[in-house]
């Protein structure tokens, strides 16, 4: 079993289990009115109602937050309950979670449904009610009936039966419980007990984790919740079968969480991270001081399938130490903003800034004549429609599936095939062609939608050094005053393979394009390329002050370079 397979096993098992819990804003007490209104005789029925409602909530949340996005890969999330047996102070029930996945998640293979049964205990009494808790629910996974999960793990990890059983047994030691409050607040926790997996020279020693989710049943479907995760130290060893070398990775405790409130505020915090890798070339330590972030106006938009609002986050003091020698890397800042426009479309943008420790770069590569200081990338899309977003995602899903099938047919190669293999290959090739057609149709639809809405794309790239900076920017979209009807675009796009000039002519007469590249002369001098630029690039470059500049624009159907029509 390879290192990444071991890790995947843990994540796969844990995610399936936690999904089976009730998933989770806690009230210290239920309201006094609600508590006193519940009589002892009413409590069993109330507890059952809340238990069933909380399970149904998981399916509703899936529909609102995940189901529409084809790239999520989860095509079905269903929980059913049967055998609910009620007592005076507790009840038992059997719940079944059924999951189905898109083929592109598993290399194009349809793995079928994965089901997990859970034996649930629902406790209710006056002592709990005094704390505001209507029902305390504990879930126990039935590992004796997990054939579908074992089959998936076996097929995807290619692990021994013993290790598959060991991985599934993790579920037996999984502790999941939920406190459902009278005011509809829920606190759900999932704890994974320590375990070890060994396959040949590869191993995983996992010390456990605990996840806590807090939410309100009324607002959880809108993506409002708090999550905290604590992962105990874990170590894994992987062996390279080719050269016989091995590496041991030790990860220190990981703690973090994030939350989204009803007022649209967002916070995220991850405590310092430390990872040690021991291999034949020595000890390498990767560290960072943590991740912090905040946001406002954050709200899930089911049409666009993402959160709206403004968010900023920081990754602080990234550094690497190799055999005692320190290499400070820098900091990362990220900003995003997604807003709905008056037209019903969306403006979405993101900015990424990497503050670089130039001394470290020079230390690693002394031949570099400058010290990099920062790299900034900024992208903004204006007037993006939800339909265009959906078409793009569906196109990417179909394209991914076609690539998966292509990989399968390439494995067969051009060797002589028996009749069964030849027929199977032919069916795969037909399926691949079908997916390629779907992808082409979806991408075409997304383009038509973007043209109709005059969607614009703005891109900026900036690199700063101790000797100056270089920038590139581009802004493009259909002109605001364009009067070309959608039907003309649709016809040109549909016939682009037979008559590409029709689409080119439409773009030439309707596309608004502005692009600029700029670099400080002080930087080109330091890099030793100033003479080359002036001798070989005079046709494309102009000088503005202390900068070399190249500008490209489409001016009413005429492409211009630095204000002059292109000579070709």
Where are these regions (language model features)?
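Bacterial N-terminal signal peptides that target proteins for export
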Residues: 1-7
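Short acidic DE-rich linear segments
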Residues: 7, 22-23
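Hydrophobic alpha-helical targeting segments used for export or membrane insertion
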Residues: 8-12
């Amino acid at each position: 079993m390879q290192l990444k397979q071991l890790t995947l096993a843990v994540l796969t098992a844990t995610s399936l289990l936690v999904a089976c819990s009730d998933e989770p804003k806690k009230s210290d007490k239920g309201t006094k009115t609600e508590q006193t209104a519940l009589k002892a005789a009413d409590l069993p029925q109330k507890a059952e109602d809340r238990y069933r409602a909380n399970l149904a909530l998981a399916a509703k949340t899936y529909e609102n937050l995940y189901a529409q996005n084809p790239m999520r890969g989860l095509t079905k999330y269903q929980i059913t309950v049967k055998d609910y047996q009620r007592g005076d102070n507790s009840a038992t029930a059997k719940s079944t979670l059924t999951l189905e996945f898109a083929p592109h998640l598993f290399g194009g293979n349809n793995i079928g449904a994965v089901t997990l049964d859970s034996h649930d205990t629902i406790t209710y009494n006056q002592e709990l009610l005094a704390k505001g808790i209507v029902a305390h629910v504990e879930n126990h996974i039935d590992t004796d009936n997990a054939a579908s999960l074992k089959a998936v793990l076996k097929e995807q990890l290619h692990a021994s039966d013993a290790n598959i059983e060991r991985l599934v047994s993790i579920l037996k030691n999984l502790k999941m419980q939920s406190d459902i409050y009278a005011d509809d607040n829920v606190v759900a926790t999932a704890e994974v007990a320590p375990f070890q997996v060994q396959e040949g020279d590869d191993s995983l020693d996992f010390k456990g984790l605990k996840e806590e989710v807090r939410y309100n049943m009324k607002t959880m479907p809108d993506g409002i919740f708090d999550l905290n995760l604590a992962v105990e130290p874990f170590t894994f060893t992987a062996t390279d079968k080719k050269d016989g070398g091995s590496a041991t990775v030790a990860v220190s405790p990981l703690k973090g969480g994030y939350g989204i409130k009803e007022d649209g505020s967002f916070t995220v915090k991850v405590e310092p991270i430390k990872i040690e890798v021991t291999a034949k070339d020595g000890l390498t330590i990767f560290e960072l001081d943590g991740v912090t972030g905040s946001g406002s106006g954050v709200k899930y938009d089911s049409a666009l399938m993402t959160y709206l609002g403004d968010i900023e986050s920081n990754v602080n003091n990234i550094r690497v130490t190799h055999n005692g020698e320190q290499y400070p890397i820098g900091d990362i800042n990220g900003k995003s903003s997604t807003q709905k426009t008056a037209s019903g479309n969306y403006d979405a943008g993101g900015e990424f800034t990497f503050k670089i420790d130039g001394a470290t770069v020079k230390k690693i590569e002394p031949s570099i004549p400058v010290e990099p200081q920062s790299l900034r990338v900024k992208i903004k899309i204006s007037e993006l429609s939800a339909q265009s977003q959906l078409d793009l995602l569906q196109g990417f899903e179909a394209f991914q599936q076609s690539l998966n099938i292509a990989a399968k047919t390439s494995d067969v190669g051009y060797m002589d095939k028996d009749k069964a293999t030849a027929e199977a290959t032919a069916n795969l090739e037909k399926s691949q062609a079908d997916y390629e057609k779907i992808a082409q149709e979806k991408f075409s639809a997304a383009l038509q939608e973007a043209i109709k809405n005059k969607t614009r794309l703005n891109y900026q790239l900036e690199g700063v050094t101790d000797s100056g900076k270089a920038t590139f920017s581009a802004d493009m979209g259909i002109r605001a005053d364009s009067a070309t009807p959608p039907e003309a675009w649709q016809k040109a796009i549909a016939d682009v393979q037979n008559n590409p000039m029709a689409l080119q002519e439409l773009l030439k007469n309707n596309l608004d394009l502005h692009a600029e590249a700029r670099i400080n002369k002080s930087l080109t001098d330091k890099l030793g390329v100033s003479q080359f630029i002036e001798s070989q690039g005079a046709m494309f470059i102009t000088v503005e002050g202390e900068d070399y500049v190249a500008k490209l624009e489409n001016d009413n159907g005429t492409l211009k370079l630095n204000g002059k029509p292109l000579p070709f």
